[in-house]
From Swiss-Prot:
CDD domains: S14_ClpP_2. NCBIfam families: clpP, PRK00277.1, PRK12553.1. InterPro entries: ClpP, ClpP/crotonase-like_dom_sf, ClpP/TepA, ClpP_His_AS, ClpP_Ser_AS. Its EC number is 3.4.21.92. This is ATP-dependent Clp protease proteolytic subunit. GO terms for molecular function: ATP-dependent peptidase activity; ATPase binding; serine-type endopeptidase activity. Cleaves peptides in various proteins in a process that requires ATP hydrolysis. Has a chymotrypsin-like activity. Plays a major role in the degradation of misfolded proteins. Keywords: Cytoplasm, Hydrolase, Protease, Serine protease. Transmembrane segments: none annotated.
Amino acid sequence: MRDPVDTYMNYLVPMVVEQTNRGERAYDIYSRLLKERIIFLTGPVEDGMSTLAVAQLLFLEAENPKKEISMYINSPGGVVTSGLAIYDTMQFIRPAVSTLCIGQAASMGSLLLTAGEKGLRFALPNARIMVHQPSGGFQGQVTDIMLHAQEILSLKKRLNEIYVKHTGQPIEKIEDALERDNFMTANAAQEFGLIDTVIDKRPSDEPAKA
């Protein structure tokens, strides 16, 4: 009987086979796309996903520090500190990182989308982008609750500053936009400055690898 975990993973992650001068070589689809300098950020932003994304960014920088990296984002958001680890690495490495929203980029997903290289931040026409302030909960002694509240306020301030930096919007407009869940179409996100371009087709002169 086949292992149900193996069946599940094989169903979700297709394998591709390439012919090389040494014979056939099989890759899972994401490893093959990584060869083309494409990184996928899909699902909730948490420590495991963040670690993989950071590792891929660092690997691609070491492989070629001058060649652009493409990041495809479809994420509902997640843990702020995990997202900031990816954000800081995107800013730290030498290659330009282009970002493309497919599906959705919500919460920390939207921050990573707008953190791409200026002029290289894209969304497909039916993508949805959502921004809001950080949220969290804590129970315990009053002093501990106050400390955690101060930390969330500090994170809120820092996230607002990042959005200001990448969108060019004044802090007052960012604070107002992030006060509640703020859903945007791709065109609205472009007007707001979260992305640079809404694209519906790959340019005919652009190779299909990126």
